[in-house]
């Protein structure tokens, strides 16, 4: 780890861990305290929304009712996003005159944004109108994040309550998460990004004259559109000179802010946060990285406060941070060094592997952003992940395959890590012959079934989907690179979709009916099967009586528990993928060696 990256990592984590406790305390009170002074400004609006929608905020739900509400809400969101894409050619705020999105791409995109994945198989600036970007995609960036946070609060209430049949009210949780947490933070971040040069307008695309003309050769075509040949049978060409460029415009900052805070990741432009209109400066890059992890880190403190012991949240956060630092080190070391092939040629490796990276960020900031965005289930990128070295790409891929629990998504990261915590405690209890318990709740057979479903759904989707994609002609047709790297592209795509990340190895041609359907189904089931299992677990825990702490109870706040949790995540989460990783990035790395 070089000194520049080490300094950047320490500075970044210091700011993150200083801010997280304050935000965590605010989130708890904003979500649970109806008399919190800091949210008094929006209470009238909250009550109005309940009245207009016919919601009784005092009526709580069982876990089944909560799950049904989540699914209905998400299905309605899917329908709305799909319809807006298909009808955008007839709707306003479409200065470029973009037509309807194809049915398979609209299907994939609607699931992608509703599931908090934001996988983009299309180029946004040439596919989506301003209205679709604002009313469909940006709105779902808020709502999908609110769903994840709501499910987490239902699970935390399961730990905090005892002898109770309910886990909260989804409509209240989603409303408060959006109104009091996501909207204020997004407004503040959007203004900060605008100050750094991120654009925010609804102007038509601009055609500008470039400083230097570009020329290229193009085949001459006859009246039928076929290439013209000379007497020797060679194609005739003509030289074209271009000195203009079309610059895409749009309301970028407002979508950029919530894409990061909501850990959605879908860019307003195809280059995502590598685009200077989305991420123009070093300061904007730092703000974007902080925005990605601030809510997941803060929710660890929220969890500790709600269960009555802040040390519980700190222990979870410590495990996340240690895993994060380890994989950041792996990625940075791989990117700072040249690839094995270039090293063999004695190329100058002073700058590291700069392929696919923006010179304004360099290797250190690009590698850290890659780890941040895949530690969270964000998917925003400031470098092209397909250009990472074999070992450099292994780090981000592994972070997703761990189940997006190293910080993870808004709410989803912590409830995924809590599932691993229950599994670790259960295994430890079996090893010492004691009934496993966590936070005073006895862990029984039903609980472990739900934990197993939550943990194993995504590996099944990733491995089965990858096997299908590399076994059928439609899947193989999308692989633009042969061998191990082509396999890595498919494995990365399924890992990203099933774990609701959204980033990609862009060498895979995924905007096809086959991949749009396959990845869409992986995103849907990877999101909502896990949510239903977590809510069932929450209902089971809420109904249990709290056991008194005894000398034989396993402490869940110290170094032993942190090591146990990290070991469980690595053994259960990572070992599942060892054969697939051996065929992909590991094989690619070994093949590149002279």
Curated annotation (Swiss-Prot):
Pfam name, any one: KdpA
GO cellular component: plasma membrane
Membrane disposition: Multi-pass membrane protein
Residues annotated as transmembrane: 4-24, 65-85, 136-156, 179-199, 287-307, 314-334, 361-381, 390-410, 413-433, 450-470, 518-538, 560-580
GO MF terms held by the record: P-type potassium transmembrane transporter activity; potassium ion binding
Keyword line: Cell inner membrane, Cell membrane, Ion transport, Membrane, Potassium, Potassium transport, Transmembrane, Transmembrane helix, Transport
Chief subcellular location: membrane
Entry's localization field: Cell inner membrane
Subunit organization: The system is composed of three essential subunits: KdpA, KdpB and KdpC.
PANTHER family: POTASSIUM-TRANSPORTING ATPASE A CHAIN, POTASSIUM-TRANSPORTING ATPASE POTASSIUM-BINDING SUBUNIT
Role of this protein: Part of the high-affinity ATP-driven potassium transport (or Kdp) system, which catalyzes the hydrolysis of ATP coupled with the electrogenic transport of potassium into the cytoplasm. This subunit binds the periplasmic potassium ions and delivers the ions to the membrane domain of KdpB through an intramembrane tunnel.
Family to which this protein belongs: Belongs to the KdpA family.
Protein name: Potassium-transporting ATPase potassium-binding subunit
